[in-house]
Amino acid sequence: TPNSYDMEYIPNLDMRSYILHHDINKLTEYIYGVITTLKSTTTYTIDFTDIYKEKLTKIDFDNNFIFDKETLLSKLPKSIPISEYHGDLTLDNILYSLKDTDFVLIDPIQTEYSSYIFDIAKLRQDLKCKWFVRNESNIYMNSKLAIIDHELSKFEYNDDYLLILMLLRILP
């Protein structure tokens, strides 16, 4: 039918299961490799100020926030490299193929955040803020996520304000 896709089913582990039962080094290397590959496609930089402003107009900054829109806008990096990107690089969108014993990225999207930099920020909502395991607590999981987050800290623009921007889009 039009506007539908037929995708192969991949027998897999989701990242929650993988992280709990496997060594974290293979996943860390995979994520680092994905980001490095995306970064290698950088062509030029653009100023994202107008895109930030547009996105922030949709957020209701009430008294529950410790800063206002202008403060956040002033802290965000403006000139960002344009590159290939996933668009929704979260741990929920990485599977471990049991057949191929390797990782598979799923569900890429097009977005105005057209840089690997925003993929890092989205990934950090899972690594630093534990979004994908928000309904459970596991110290073992937390320590493994911290290892991956530490590896991502080697990339430029590993920025907490970009992380805040990504979190604002999913707040209730």
Task: Show the residue positions of the predicted features.
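Long, hydrophobic, amphipathic alpha-helical segments used as structural scaffolds
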Residues: 1, 39-46, 131, 135
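Conserved kinase catalytic-core helix
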Residues: 15-85, 160
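Short, flexible helix/strand-to-coil boundary loops that buttress conserved ligand/catalytic motifs
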Residues: 19, 109, 127
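Active-site acidic catalytic loop and adjacent metal/ATP-binding pocket
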Residues: 71-118
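Histidine-centered active-site/metal-ligand motif
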Residues: 7, 39, 86, 90
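Short catalytic/ligand-binding loop motif for oxyanion handling, primarily in non-cytosolic enzymes
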Residues: 14-17, 93, 112-114, 131-133
